[in-house]
């Protein structure tokens, strides 16, 4: 109550921020007449002037009013578009390390040009981040004329580009690209073997479009660069064939997992667990097909990988549905993004899940991968000196932006008042009733010329609605992951009178739905349109536009509520842009995923009490409140998952930063001879200490063990026993010094052969390779530790603290292993003179030829009988001299059994 009263008197923090910024907007507006008087050359010269002032020590923010006024004037001359005052406000919010919430259709792309220009003046680079390649390319090409007019360069960073092209894109003042590509480039740069291979500059300013999608929806998915691991595709196929024998348990006792079924499914956490009966059955089935010995337990250490395969196969069958979670296209399983409905080409599920789904669908199974490098978006974007973002729906996630990214959310007012009508939800008992009501609503609205956009949560649902519309004889377009290429065209024309468009989730974000259709798209279809043709198209569009407004504007139909209120708001936000008329309504049923998992019992009881009949809908504030509570529950759980992921990844992040810093110092620095000498001392001290403990009696020394260790691991043949026999005065300290001196001399003798320059290059290469190899193994070990760490909770220990403690112990051990491996490899390397190499190569060739002749003669002797038998088998069939020999040796017939028959 008190907070509400104080807000009423002093205004909210949002209001106070906007009040302060409006004063700067007035200042920019006062500069407009002066800017209009400038010639193009003088306006372009402003960029050089601003950079000069920055070089003399001026603060970047002191240039803001003049820089924004310059961009606004340049936009008027290049595009014929003037930034609204609210867009200037949005630009200021983005410059202040904040999230700007700007409604759909308010011109976020044009707003972004203001802070992008201002921050590009520093010369450190600006990264504009979009959700897909199409938007990155579109926005870069659309804004390029404006930035180039002002003397700034623009780059586009797309997947599959060659390193020189990427380097040029990053060297530009402003770079457009996708979040995935920026993240992967960062990881690839930290796997480079020379400074020239790296493409990114220091991360300065990131301007994230659709910031909620990138920093929240995708935050649970880490970016992983992986390499091939061992092949186990056969095992996936064998295990997959056993899963249909298992029966799902409808209700289970969560404590004992007793019941009729063989496995239970928890849809909330997306986990599958075997029951006691299921475990017994799967062990019997595995024994029957010979994968496991009879009487053996699936939980025994030897079968731990088999358990992993069974769990992956169960999850693939019970939790992952075709055309909802993935599609199968040209023999490949492609993941569908649950938030956008787009396919994610090249992305694969980890932990063997993708291979299990491939086995289930009967397509070719790709090898499992091993993690080489990984980072979450949360940690990648926090590497930027300055981060800002914009979206149409951020306010519901303001707390998360603030607590994780330290970004405040500012709601920017609309240019014109919003007049869209958001109608209350209608809830039906069954999905069939709901679909019938949706079809009827579409029929009524299209009859009066109102365009309708139907939002679905999956490809499967979009195709179901499409099928019903086809049956009802209603023409429509479908926009889902299967028709990704036509996305922009379908969305652009979704506002035509009476048009019906079905879209999965937020497919088509970034393209505005113009009421009356897009006249620009129609003009683009003509090769060289005349002025008269353009005017005729515009006049026709104006007629359609007015007709759609008269019919009530664009109507949005949501076929079910999403887990997040924000994504529902994004769907609604497609209507009512720039003060246009519009309406929206959600149709729900008790069979919807969200309702079934989180709210069905409460709402079903409510509907029964109200005496609901099949086909009837309930429309009540209580129901809407129950659904909102269910969504809040899911949002809260997802936030906890993301926060927990971040807390665990922060541990890995500190280690990643240490490794990458060390790696970059290696790449950028000179030789590493001092480092090698230093770690050689450390390594030999540890080795000698383990056989000759400090300040110990000679009787306690294991001299034979030390000699063997030095011989095996460091290629050092040292007669330590002989030294001790011949030199009684040799004590522990002098012995240590002598061993180290001999090791250094042994190494220097190699250096004298190849030369210092080559040895320095070799040292650096070995250090990088060893570091990468051990880091890869460390990441795998961290993954395993992470998977089982929650079990420490049963021992009354905090899993997070245990994870931190153990992971840092593992990290320290890895650094010690790095020192040991590097010195061991460098000590054992065989160095030869060029003439020695040539002589050895000649000897190797002669040995190989002699061995081949012996094998051939042996092969001919052993198989002469087989040749006679084969001749009788082939009968009259003539074998060509150059045909492959029927014995299966792989040689030509004339060089194998043909000789015996000759």
From Swiss-Prot:
GO molecular function: ATP binding; metal ion binding; protein-exporting ATPase activity
GO CC field: cell envelope Sec protein transport complex; cytosol; plasma membrane
EC number: 7.4.2.8
Expression induction or repression: Repressed under conditions of excess protein secretion capacity and derepressed when protein secretion becomes limiting. This is regulated by SecM.
Primary localization: membrane
Topology with respect to the bilayer: Peripheral membrane protein
Cofactor annotation: Zn(2+)
CDD domains the UniProt entry points to: DEXDc_SecA (cd17928), SF2_C_secA (cd18803)
Similarity remark: Belongs to the SecA family.
NCBIfam families per UniProt: PRK12904.1 (NF009538), secA (TIGR00963)
Function: Part of the Sec protein translocase complex. Interacts with the SecYEG preprotein conducting channel. Has a central role in coupling the hydrolysis of ATP to the transfer of proteins into and across the cell membrane, serving both as a receptor for the preprotein-SecB complex and as an ATP-driven molecular motor driving the stepwise translocation of polypeptide chains across the membrane.
Protein name in the entry: Protein translocase subunit SecA
Organism: Edwardsiella ictaluri (strain 93-146)
């Amino acid at each position: 109550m008190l907070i509400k009263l104080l807000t009423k008197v002093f205004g909210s923090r949002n209001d106070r921020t906007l009040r302060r910024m409006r004063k700067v907007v007035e200042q920019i507006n006062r500069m407009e007449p002066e800017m209009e008087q400038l010639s193009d050359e003088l306006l372009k010269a402003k960029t050089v002037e601003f950079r000069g002032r920055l070089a003399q020590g001026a603060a970047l923010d002191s240039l803001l009013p003049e820089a924004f006024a310059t961009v606004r004037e340049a936009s008027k001359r290049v595009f014929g578009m003037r930034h609204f005052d609210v867009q200037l406000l949005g630009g200021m919010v983005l410059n202040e390390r904040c999230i700007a919430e700007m409604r759909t259709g308010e011109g976020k792309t044009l707003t972004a040009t203001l802070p992008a220009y201002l921050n590009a003046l520093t010369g450190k680079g600006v990264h504009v981040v979009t959700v897909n390649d199409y938007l990155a390319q579109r926005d870069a090409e659309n804004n390029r004329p404006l930035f180039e007019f002002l003397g700034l360069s623009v780059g586009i960073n797309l997947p599959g580009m060659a390193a020189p092209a990427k380097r040029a894109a990053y060297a530009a003042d402003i770079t457009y690209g996708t979040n995935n590509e920026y993240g992967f480039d960062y990881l690839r740069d930290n796997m480079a073997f020379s400074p020239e291979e790296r493409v990114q500059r220091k991360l300065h300013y990131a301007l994230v479009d659709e910031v909620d999608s990138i920093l929240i929806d995708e935050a649970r998915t880490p970016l992983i660069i992986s390499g091939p691991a061992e092949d186990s595709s056969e095992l996936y196929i064998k295990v997959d064939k056993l899963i249909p024998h298992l029966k799902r348990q409808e209700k289970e006792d969560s404590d004992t997992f007793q019941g009729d079924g063989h496995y239970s499914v928890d849809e909330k956490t997306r986990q599958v667990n075997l029951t006691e009966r299921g475990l017994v059955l799967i062990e019997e089935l595995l024994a029957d097909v010979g994968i496991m010995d009879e009487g053996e337990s699936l939980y025994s250490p030897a079968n731990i990988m088999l358990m992993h395969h069974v769990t992956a196969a169960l999850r693939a069958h019970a939790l992952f549905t075709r055309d909802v979670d993935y599609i199968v296209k040209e023999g490949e399983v492609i993941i569908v993004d649950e938030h956008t409905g787009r396919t994610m080409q090249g992305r694969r599920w980890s932990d063997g899940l993708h291979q299990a789904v491939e086995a289930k669908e009967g397509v070719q199974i790709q090898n499992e991968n091993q993690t080489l490098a990984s980072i979450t978006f949360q940690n990648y974007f926090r590497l930027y000196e300055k981060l800002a973002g914009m979206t149409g729906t951020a306010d519901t996630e303001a707390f998360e932006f603030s607590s994780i990214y330290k970004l405040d959310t500012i709601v920017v007012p609309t240019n014109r008042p919003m007049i869209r009508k958001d109608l209350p939800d209608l809830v039906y008992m069954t999905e069939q009733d709901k679909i019938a009501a949706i079809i009827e609503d579409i029929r009524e609205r299209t009859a009066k010329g109102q365009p309708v956009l139907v939002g679905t949560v999956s490809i499967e649902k979009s195709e179901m609605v499409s099928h019903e519309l086809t049956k009802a004889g209603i023409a429509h377009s479908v926009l889902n992951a299967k028709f990704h290429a036509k996305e922009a065209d379908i969305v652009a024309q979704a506002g035509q009178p009476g048009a019906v468009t079905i879209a999965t989730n937020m497919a088509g974000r970034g393209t505005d739905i113009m009421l009356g259709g897009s006249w620009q798209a129609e003009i683009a279809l003509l090769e060289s349109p005349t002025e008269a043709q353009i005017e005729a198209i515009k006049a026709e569009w104006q007629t359609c536009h007015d007709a759609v407004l008269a019919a009530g504007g664009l109507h949005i139909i949501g076929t079910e509520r999403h887990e997040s209120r924000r994504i529902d708001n994004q769907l609604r936000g497609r209507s009512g842009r720039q003060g246009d008329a519009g309406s929206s309504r959600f149709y729900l049923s008790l069979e919807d995923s969200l309702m079934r998992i989180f709210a069905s019992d409460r709402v079903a009881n409510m509907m029964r009490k109200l005496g609901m009949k099949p086909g009837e809908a309930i429309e009540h504030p209580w129901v809407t409140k129950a659904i909102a509570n269910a969504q809040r529950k899911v949002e809260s759980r997802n936030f906890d998952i993301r926060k927990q992921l971040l807390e665990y990844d922060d541990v890995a992040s500190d280690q990643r930063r240490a490794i990458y810093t060390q790696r970059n110092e290696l790449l950028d620095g000179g030789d590493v001879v001092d480092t090698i000498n230093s770690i050689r001392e450390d390594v030999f001290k540890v080795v000698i200490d383990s056989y000759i403990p400090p300040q110990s009696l000679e009787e306690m020394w294991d001299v034979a063990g030390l000699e063997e260790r030095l011989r095996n691991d460091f290629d050092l043949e040292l007669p330590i026993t002989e030294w001790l026999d011949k030199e009684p005065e040799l004590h522990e300290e002098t012995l240590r010094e002598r061993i180290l001196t001999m090791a250094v001399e042994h190494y220097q003798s190699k250096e004298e052969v190849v030369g210092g320059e080559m040895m320095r290059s070799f040292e650096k290469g070995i250090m990088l390779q060893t570091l990468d190899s051990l880091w890869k193994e460390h990441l795998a070990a961290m993954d395993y530790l992470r998977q089982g760490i929650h079990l420490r909770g049963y021992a009354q220990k905090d899993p997070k603290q245990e994870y931190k403690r153990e992971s840092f112990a593992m990290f320290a051990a890895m650094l010690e292993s790095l020192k040991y491996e590097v010195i061991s490899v460098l000590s054992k390397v065989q160095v030869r003179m060029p003439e020695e190499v040539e002589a050895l190569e000649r000897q190797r060739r002669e040995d190989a030829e002699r061995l081949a002749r012996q094998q051939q003669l042996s092969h001919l002797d052993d198989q002469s009988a087989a040749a006679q038998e084969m001749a009788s088998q082939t009968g009259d069939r003539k074998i060509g001299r150059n045909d492959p020999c029927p014995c299966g040796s792989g040689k030509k017939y004339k060089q194998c059994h043909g000789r015996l028959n000759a």
